[in-house]
Swiss-Prot record:
It is found in: Plastid, Cyanelle. Keywords: Cyanelle, DNA-binding, Phosphoprotein, Plastid, Transcription, Transcription regulation, Two-component regulatory system. One of its GO terms (biological process) is regulation of DNA-templated transcription. The lineage of its organism: Eukaryota, Glaucocystophyceae, Cyanophoraceae, Cyanophora. The keyword Transcription regulation applies. Residues 3-119 form the Response regulatory domain. GO terms for molecular function: phosphorelay response regulator activity; transcription cis-regulatory region binding. SMART domains: HTH_LUXR, REC. This is Probable transcriptional regulator ycf29. InterPro entries: CheY-like_superfamily (IPR011006), Sig_transdc_resp-reg_C-effctor (IPR016032), Sig_transdc_resp-reg_receiver (IPR001789), Tscrpt_reg_LuxR_C (IPR000792), WalR-like (IPR039420), WH-like_DNA-bd_sf (IPR036388). The gene is ycf29. It comes from the Eukaryota.
Length: 210
């Protein structure tokens, strides 16, 4: 369930918003001041804030500024409410980092559309970021690939990478050439390579040498 925090001193606004938003499936928390809002943020997971600009003490702009400076809440969606429809206020709001802006009195259905649009945008951004991070992780993982080699397989691989022939590897490890050939074949299978050149390249690219 999506959790929305309403920060507004107007009890009528809070009650009407809570009633409507709850009926359409949102969970709503209420706050009348910034300190109370911070307390709620620390205790509960909030997905979006609807915040009035004009409040006693710290106003909505300053609260938004604090949010954007906090690494835990810097991307938290915020919709600003105001009784003032001044262009300068909207400019300040957007520069400070609000996601949307609506003037009182407002149509609650319009606000819901704005809420859904903001949440959808943030969800898409989050999914793209997660995909990018996942791809980065997979790239790092592939560059540091771990394959379970037996001690003898690892020894053979190390010598293959050094450029030794099967006869030389056999002499070095005091085993027969036929046994070396079997180990090399196993290495091809485990690394999905087809020849010694591919095996060496694969081993070097994935840090498989010990």
């Amino acid at each position: 369930m999506i959790n929305i925090l309403i920060l507004d001193t107007d009890i009528g606004i809070r009650n009407s918003l809570k009633l409507y938003l709850t009926e359409i499936g949102f969970h709503v928390e209420e706050s009348t001041c910034v300190d109370q809002a911070w307390d709620i943020l620390k205790r509960k997971k909030i997905d979006l804030i609807i915040c009035d600009i004009i409040m006693p003490g710290m106003g909505g702009f300053n609260f938004l500024h604090q949010l954007r400076l906090n690494t835990d809440y810097c991307t938290l969606p915020v919709i600003l409410l105001t009784t003032r429809g001044l262009t300068q206020d909207r400019i300040i709001g957007y520069k400070t980092g609000c996601d949307s802006y609506i003037s009182k009195p407002f149509n609650i259905e319009e606000l819901v559309v704005i809420i859904e649009g903001v949440l959808n945008r943030h969800t898409l951004i989050r999914l793209k970021l997660e995909k990018k991070q996942k791809n980065s992780f997979l790239l790092i993982k592939s560059n540091n690939l771990k394959i379970n080699f037996t001690p003898r397989e690892q020894s053979v691989l190390n010598l293959v990478v050094e450029g030794l022939l099967n006869k030389q590897i056999a002499a070095n490890l005091n085993i027969s050439i036929r046994i070396v050939e079997k180990y090399v074949s196993r290495l091809f299978i485990k690394t999905k390579t087809r020849n010694r050149a591919e095996l060496v390249k694969y081993a070097l690219e994935n840090n498989l040498i010990t």
